[in-house]
Amino acid sequence: MSFRFSGRSRVCSRAGSVRLSRGGAGFVAGNVCVGPGAEGSFSCTLGGLSSGGSFASEGSGRGSSIGFLNNEPGLFSGNEKVAMQNLNDRLALYLNHVSALEEANTDLEKKIEGWYEKCGPGRGRRLDHDCSRYFSVIEDLKRQILSMTTCNANLVLQNDNARLTADDFKMKYENELALHQSVEADTNGLRRVLDELTLSTTDLEIQREALSEELTYLQKNHEEEMVVLQNASGGNINVEMNAAPSVDLTAMLNNMRAEYEDLAEQNRKDAEASFKEKSASLQQQISDDAGAATAARNELMELKRNLQTLEIELQSITAMKQSYENSLAETEGNYYAQLQQIQEQIGAREEQLQQIRTETEGQKLEHEQLLGIKTCLEKEIDTYCNLLDGEEQRSESTSYKPKDGKPASEFNDSAEETFARTVAEELDQLGNLLSLRVHSVEEKSSKISNITMEQRVPSKAP
């Protein structure tokens, strides 16, 4: 707040004079003179006796001096002098209070701006909740969650495919096992047939050996008979008989032997052919069954290896799925904890903002109270100035008569003073008062002095 009063007035009396220097501001009440001003001074000398005193006010190089007249009561006396002193004291306290509040407001504004520069993108008194810096983190988390969900779905699909493949291989294994059991049963049946054929072959061999022994026995008997007959024919006995022609036993025996040999050979050939045929077919069937059994055994081993591989892959996929689920749960827990911390930080910042807003509202109310006090003080200052103007006019209208009877115009200025004040208020778009200017014009002895009082109203918090 600045209050400037410029002008020049002169009060002449027998005791002394009061001087107001241009560029300062002065208030005169009786024998009290107060003059705060930038690069200006105020002095009051009454009756050759001066005394000085000062109080704190706005700016540097501002002071006041108070002088008391020893032998004259001054312009005012009694309660008016005390009232003027109280007004001066209250004005000084008001100026000090306003200065301290302006410094406190400036400090708070700097702190608020610094806090916004550190904790948010807002500037000045804008209370923006900018969470755009968290959007990228949230989008990244969403992408990771979507990727994890897709990966989990792929793993579930692969697991289902592996389970279906395992079921298919299990079904094939059961079919091959049934086929293998059937082949083994056929092989066992063929082995029984082979045993029967072996027994038949042994029986035929026994029969052949028996026939061979019988043939050998017959041959031996025939030889013995032939020897007997030859011995009998070698004697001198001549027997002449008239008989029918005898049967040739040798030819009969030879024929019988040939028939038996042919029959035995035929039986042997038939037995060998049948044995070879059955053996060949049995060997072919055995070889076929052995090849099929070998192929089935190889396929069974391959299926066992595939089953073991699939079981291992299934176990690894199950473990990987479990680890992914654990990792997903842990990641969700971590990000949930981080989001909770961020929410807590946001809540703390909102509480701080609410506290700052409350403090700002309190300062606003205090500022409004100070504005009311300022208005009251301005009214008191106007009253004070009116009193000063009235006393100056009375002092100028008082004539001084010396012993020789000359008129008082020889010692006083007879010029008439005229004051004109203009009040200018500056408002913003919301109707808040930004500045208050009071322009005063004093006319004295055809001279114009400007009195300007400017009041800057601090901007209110939004």
From Swiss-Prot:
Region entry Coil 1B, spans: 138-229
User: Which Gene3D superfamilies does the entry link to?
Assistant: 1.20.5.170, Single helix bin, Vasodilator-stimulated phosphoprotein
An annotated GO cellular component: intermediate filament
* Compositionally biased residues, Basic and acidic residues: 265-279, 392-407
Q: Which InterPro entries match?
A: IF_rod_dom, Keratin_I
Q: Region Coil 2: which residues?
A: 253-391
**What residue spans carry the region label Linker 12?**
230-252
What Pfam families does its record include? Filament
Residue ranges of the region described as Tail: 392-459
| A GO molecular-function descriptor | structural molecule activity
Keyword terms of this UniProt record: Coiled coil, Intermediate filament, Keratin
In this chain, the stretch annotated as Coil 1A covers: 80-115
Stretches the record annotates as Head: 1-79
Signal peptide (residue range)? none
Keyword Lyase assigned? no
Q: Where is this region: Linker 1?
A: 116-137
| Domain IF rod positions | 80-395
Reproduce the miscellaneous comment text: There are two types of cytoskeletal and microfibrillar keratin: I (acidic; 40-55 kDa) and II (neutral to basic; 56-70 kDa).
Q: Which PANTHER family does the entry mention? A: INTERMEDIATE FILAMENT (PTHR23239), KERATIN, TYPE I CYTOSKELETAL 26 (PTHR23239:SF162)
Q: How does it assemble?
A: Heterotetramer of two type I and two type II keratins.
Give the similarity note: Belongs to the intermediate filament family.
Q: What is this protein called?
A: Keratin, type I cytoskeletal 26
The gene that this protein is the product of is: Krt26
